[in-house]
Amino acid sequence: MSYINLPTVLPSSPSKTRGQIQVILGPMFSGKSTELMRRVRRFQIAQYKCLVIKYAKDTRYSNSFSTHDRNTMDALPACMLRDVTQESLGVAVIGIDEGQFFPDIVDFCEMMANEGKTVIVAALDGTFQRKAFGSILNLVPLAESVVKLTAVCMECFREAAYTKRLGLEKEVEVIGGADKYHSVCRLCYFKKSSAQTAGSDNKNCLVLGQPGEALVVRKLFASQQVLQYNSAN
């Protein structure tokens, strides 16, 4: 029997780690941050030097980034990714949470991947209006790996691909959790929430702005009419 002896390091082996971009998309509550954390920890176990970057305006968890079930990991806050370029060049793996909020996400990820870094981005793909969120979708053609996760619809328990805002705010960037957003399916996306229904009802109230005030006034007038009737008799 003959054996083939292969060298431990092949001549064609790269001299440094090859860079790549991995993108994790999906609605809120679909497990994007959990998957980002899992991938980063996998590299940490293999003794790679890792850095996680979080959006600085999300101050809910101090200097950590957190999943919705309160698993946390140390993170470097930033509003612009270019502000943490030096820190990023000193590591092998870069994790970016809430990538949709960073206006320079595309240029930064491409630059770091070309420097041999593994860049893992977790981001919302769409706004509460189901429109592209910032420039995050421009990262898709540049990425080696793209996955879109789904959540469970918080109104009917089917598969959920969208994020629905519960309040009446119109601006795109409103940071919050289950108090402000639901993950929903296509059918439930078009159903009005209780807050939206209350808001539309208030617009139709010509005299009094608060629900229930008209009922109080009617009771008040009824009491006055009874008093007038009793005094007349």
Curated annotation (Swiss-Prot):
<feature type="binding site">
    <location>
        <begin position="97"/>
        <end position="100"/>
    </location>
    <ligand>
        <name>ATP</name>
    </ligand>
</feature>
<dbReference type="GO" id="GO:0051289">
    <property type="term" value="P:protein homotetramerization"/>
</dbReference>
<dbReference type="GO" id="GO:0046105">
    <property type="term" value="P:thymidine biosynthetic process"/>
</dbReference>
<dbReference type="GO" id="GO:0005829">
    <property type="term" value="C:cytosol"/>
</dbReference>
<comment type="function">
    <text>Cell-cycle-regulated enzyme of importance in nucleotide metabolism. Catalyzes the first enzymatic step in the salvage pathway converting thymidine into thymidine monophosphate. Transcriptional regulation limits expression to the S phase of the cell cycle and transient expression coincides with the oscillation in the intracellular dTTP concentration.</text>
</comment>
<dbReference type="GO" id="GO:0004797">
    <property type="term" value="F:thymidine kinase activity"/>
</dbReference>
<feature type="binding site">
    <location>
        <position position="181"/>
    </location>
    <ligand>
        <name>substrate</name>
    </ligand>
</feature>
<keyword id="KW-0007">Acetylation</keyword>
<keyword id="KW-0418">Kinase</keyword>
<feature type="binding site">
    <location>
        <position position="185"/>
    </location>
    <ligand>
        <name>Zn(2+)</name>
    </ligand>
</feature>
<dbReference type="GO" id="GO:0008270">
    <property type="term" value="F:zinc ion binding"/>
</dbReference>
<comment type="subunit">
    <text>Homotetramer. Tetramerization from dimerization is induced by ATP and increases catalytic efficiency due to a high affinity for thymidine. Tetramerization is inhibited by phosphorylation at Ser-13. Interacts (via the KEN box) with FZR1.</text>
</comment>
<feature type="binding site">
    <location>
        <position position="128"/>
    </location>
    <ligand>
        <name>substrate</name>
    </ligand>
</feature>
<dbReference type="InterPro" id="IPR020633">
    <property type="entry name" value="Thymidine_kinase_CS"/>
</dbReference>
<keyword id="KW-0479">Metal-binding</keyword>
<dbReference type="GO" id="GO:0042802">
    <property type="term" value="F:identical protein binding"/>
</dbReference>
<feature type="binding site">
    <location>
        <position position="153"/>
    </location>
    <ligand>
        <name>Zn(2+)</name>
    </ligand>
</feature>
<dbReference type="GO" id="GO:0005634">
    <property type="term" value="C:nucleus"/>
</dbReference>
<comment type="similarity">
    <text>Belongs to the thymidine kinase family.</text>
</comment>
<dbReference type="GO" id="GO:0005524">
    <property type="term" value="F:ATP binding"/>
</dbReference>
<feature type="binding site">
    <location>
        <begin position="58"/>
        <end position="60"/>
    </location>
    <ligand>
        <name>ATP</name>
    </ligand>
</feature>
<feature type="binding site">
    <location>
        <begin position="26"/>
        <end position="33"/>
    </location>
    <ligand>
        <name>ATP</name>
    </ligand>
</feature>
<keyword id="KW-0237">DNA synthesis</keyword>
<keyword id="KW-0067">ATP-binding</keyword>
<feature type="modified residue" description="Phosphoserine">
    <location>
        <position position="13"/>
    </location>
</feature>
<keyword id="KW-0862">Zinc</keyword>
<keyword id="KW-0808">Transferase</keyword>
<dbReference type="GO" id="GO:0046104">
    <property type="term" value="P:thymidine metabolic process"/>
</dbReference>
<feature type="binding site">
    <location>
        <begin position="172"/>
        <end position="176"/>
    </location>
    <ligand>
        <name>substrate</name>
    </ligand>
</feature>
<dbReference type="InterPro" id="IPR027417">
    <property type="entry name" value="P-loop_NTPase"/>
</dbReference>
<feature type="modified residue" description="Phosphoserine">
    <location>
        <position position="2"/>
    </location>
</feature>
<keyword id="KW-0547">Nucleotide-binding</keyword>
<dbReference type="Pfam" id="PF00265">
    <property type="entry name" value="TK"/>
</dbReference>
<protein>
    <recommendedName>
        <fullName>Thymidine kinase, cytosolic</fullName>
        <ecNumber>2.7.1.21</ecNumber>
    </recommendedName>
</protein>
<feature type="binding site">
    <location>
        <position position="156"/>
    </location>
    <ligand>
        <name>Zn(2+)</name>
    </ligand>
</feature>
<keyword id="KW-0832">Ubl conjugation</keyword>
<dbReference type="GO" id="GO:1904860">
    <property type="term" value="P:DNA synthesis involved in mitotic DNA replication"/>
</dbReference>
<feature type="binding site">
    <location>
        <position position="188"/>
    </location>
    <ligand>
        <name>Zn(2+)</name>
    </ligand>
</feature>
<feature type="active site" description="Proton acceptor">
    <location>
        <position position="98"/>
    </location>
</feature>
<feature type="modified residue" description="N-acetylserine">
    <location>
        <position position="2"/>
    </location>
</feature>
<dbReference type="InterPro" id="IPR001267">
    <property type="entry name" value="Thymidine_kinase"/>
</dbReference>
<keyword id="KW-0597">Phosphoprotein</keyword>
